[in-house]
Amino acid sequence: QRFPQRYIELAIVVDHGMYKKYNQNSDKIKVRVHQMVNHINEMYRPLNIAISLNRLQIWSKKDLITVKSASNVTLESFGNWRETVLLKQQNNDCAHLLTATNLNDNTIGLAYKKGMCNPKLSVGLVQDYSPNVFMVAVTMTHELGHNLGMEHDDKDKCKCEACIMSDVISDKPSKLFSDCSKNDYQTFLTKYNPQCILNAP
């Protein structure tokens, strides 16, 4: 399967709780986020998607939305904030919020399916739940996958243990997308052809 080249200009926002979690050390957070983006890039390379971090905003003074442990509420607030505030400051294709808040229902991430390029829906929420940066990167890769039209791997149809779009994260997640995920992405491209990811940054 050969995929056309696409480029995602990603904005990552770090909430105030995460800023405090890393002892208000912005440099430490920057290093962590850059490592995360490197991992995400590696996982998307087989799909011919290049991810660039085009903005990193750290909410060092206070949260600019109310971050609640109800992930769907926080995701909706963040989507509204992206549309009304962030996009007016700087263009981006997609924005993800990294939070130190413990999300409800054993959730470690949430994103709108097929949201890519939509002003309000091209967002994700990821909990910085593990000291291991790769584990958090896999979660963001998973949530970006939803933005790109991917469903969870069906246990029967997708023979892929611990692949990125598995509905539960494994202790040793793989760096691979299942064939199902690749097909979902191909379908999304064909059906919607999201324009914002066509241009190189």
From Swiss-Prot:
Cofactor(s), names only, from the UniProt record: Zn(2+)
Domain Peptidase M12B: 6-201
One example GO MF annotation: metalloendopeptidase activity
Enzyme class of the recorded protein, top EC level: hydrolase
Catalytic residues in the record: E143
Residues that coordinate or bind Zn(2+): H142, H146, H152
Cofactor note: Binds 1 zinc ion per subunit.
Complexes and interactors: Monomer.
PANTHER family: ADAM A DISINTEGRIN AND METALLOPROTEASE DOMAIN (PTHR11905), DISINTEGRIN AND METALLOPROTEINASE DOMAIN-CONTAINING PROTEIN 28 (PTHR11905:SF32)
Name used for this protein in its record: Snake venom metalloproteinase trimerelysin-2
Species whose genome carries this gene: Protobothrops flavoviridis (Habu)
